[in-house]
Amino acid sequence: MKIGVFDSGVGGFSVLKSLLKAQLFDEIIYYGDSARVPYGTKDPTTIKQFGLEALDFFKPHQIKLLIVACNTASALALEEMQKHSKIPIVGVIEPSILAIKQQVKDKNAPILVLGTKATIQSNAYDNALKQQGYLNVSHLATSLFVPLIEENILEGELLETCMRYYFTPLKILPEVIILGCTHFPLIAQKIEGYFMGHFALPTPPLLIHSGDAIVGYLQQKYALKKNAHAFPKVEFHASGDVVWLEKQAKEWLKL
């Protein structure tokens, strides 16, 4: 099966990595809207338009399924995209909620949602979690992580300063952290290390990763099984510099 993966830039590599490892598909077309990243600071109308333009990009490629790897687009553009599409389109929020349901049985467990400003303001995660009965949900817009990750700053003083700025004021320490932006799994170990080092938690918080969550979701919903004989072919496209995007992919995905 040939599918598409759409993201605002390189953040979708975290989803792509999980898809490649799972080997559920024969061919993957990756489109990063890198000329207009970040999405998280833009208004809902603009994000919806970007989503519809992404659909136009994928039409000639004749894909059978589209994965919206961007949380902001999943929160604000997914429904509009589905209305204008003849193929299934899957976002990353519903799979993450399914992963929570499967792994977190305590409805009072403190859950922290990290995301871009646009994703957090949409309340998509908060509303979905409350519909499932989770009562102790907080959220935090951590948009500055995105440009750091886009610049391949995955460790060091700048990232540490950014984490300190966002996390120091927290009043309730989470047992579960939803990485509500597909960029964030690229610094997941640093986030976990910060919480363990600065808050002396007895156990590491459970990190919900969009990529792993979506693989489980696809296997369950579409009865997909691993193709043991072939590694998926990947083709990269970008609204910006595709050579740069391919270079980042080789570094991060070890292609």
Swiss-Prot record:
One of its GO terms (biological process) is regulation of cell shape. It catalyses: L-glutamate = D-glutamate. SUPFAM superfamilies: Aspartate/glutamate racemase (SSF53681). Keywords: Cell shape, Cell wall biogenesis/degradation, Isomerase, Peptidoglycan synthesis. Substrate binds at residues 7-8, 39-40, 71-72, 182-183. The keyword Cell wall biogenesis/degradation applies. Its EC number is 5.1.1.3. Pfam families: Asp_Glu_race. The active site is at residues 70, 181. Pathway: Cell wall biogenesis; peptidoglycan biosynthesis. It comes from the Bacteria. The keyword Isomerase applies. GO terms for molecular function: glutamate racemase activity. Belongs to the aspartate/glutamate racemases family. HAMAP family: Glu_racemase. Provides the (R)-glutamate required for cell wall biosynthesis. This is Glutamate racemase. It comes from Helicobacter pylori (strain P12). The gene is murI.
